[in-house]
Amino acid sequence: CRMSLCCCSAGSRRLLLSRLLLGQGRQARRPLLHLRTTATAAASSSATSLSTQQQRQVSLYVEALLDWNQRMNLTAVTDESEVMTRHVVDSLAVLPPLEHAYTSRGGDISGISLVDVGSGAGLPGLILAVARPSWKFTLLESMRKRCTFLEHAVEVMELSNVDVVCDRAESAGQSHDFRESFDVAAARAVAELKILAEYCLPLVRVGGLFIAAKGHDPHEEIRSAKAAVGKLGASMLDLCNVESMGPHGQRTAVLYLKERTTPKKYPRQPGTPSKTPL
């Protein structure tokens, strides 16, 4: 595994995130999200960075999430400002390392297709879909109730670049419609890497990327997943620190490059990857 702890320096990452959020040469707009006074400066910056329409879409997402969360388990975070810092900002923070990894290899990021595996409450997929309207997103979620929420969120946010697929990752990975069809697979807080790799890599085309949002110290997970990742046709590309307002003050993005076709026997039957990891 190549563990270069990141494709760019900490200062460069902050600059990339700033440009992502604020836009180069574009004047920041007044936020539509009425964040509480306890919200951090970073969360406020993230809110002001988006266009008026994008701010509105994020606001509608947060409103829908907190409303539906009263009736079903979508998130343990129930405060609006915490949703901004721990979900919205964290989701946006994976974009700079992802785009850097893509463009540094000569890739065109104008029309990326991304599958959010185990999307849950739509994180990071729905937030990334707001930030990158030219990309095509598929939210893959196995629980019907959560899919109903995702479909509602897509509708109220007026997102035309998002599809919701209610299926298990193991089934989708063996489906002709989805197998090795995405430029990028992304996952956040779904499972440990050696399990997650079997969910995600069969969905990624050869030459595409798998990015996993992880905690502040994923090194043991990375070591444990090395053999599984190799069997699935990929190798580690980078490990990046990303800006985070989480409890540890830092998260990481682990990036893998899909180098070879995944053997047909993977992913295995639903439930097997988690019960018997590679």
Describe the residue ranges of each PLM region.
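Short alpha-helix immediately C-terminal to the canonical SAM-binding loop
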Residues: 146-148, 218, 222
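Conserved SAM/SAH cofactor-binding pocket of Class I
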Residues: 92-191, 197-198
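Cysteine-centered motifs
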Residues: 1, 6-8
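Class I SAM-dependent transferase core
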Residues: 4, 19-115, 145-162, 269-270
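SAM/dcSAM-binding transferase cores
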Residues: 6, 223-278
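Short loop/edge segments at beta-strand edges and connector loops
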Residues: 78, 166-168, 238-240
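A short glycine-rich, Lys/Arg-flanked "PGG" loop and its adjoining helix->strand segment in the class I
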Residues: 194-210
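Short strand-turn motif at the edge of the Rossmann-like AdoMet-binding core
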Residues: 142, 190, 213-217, 241
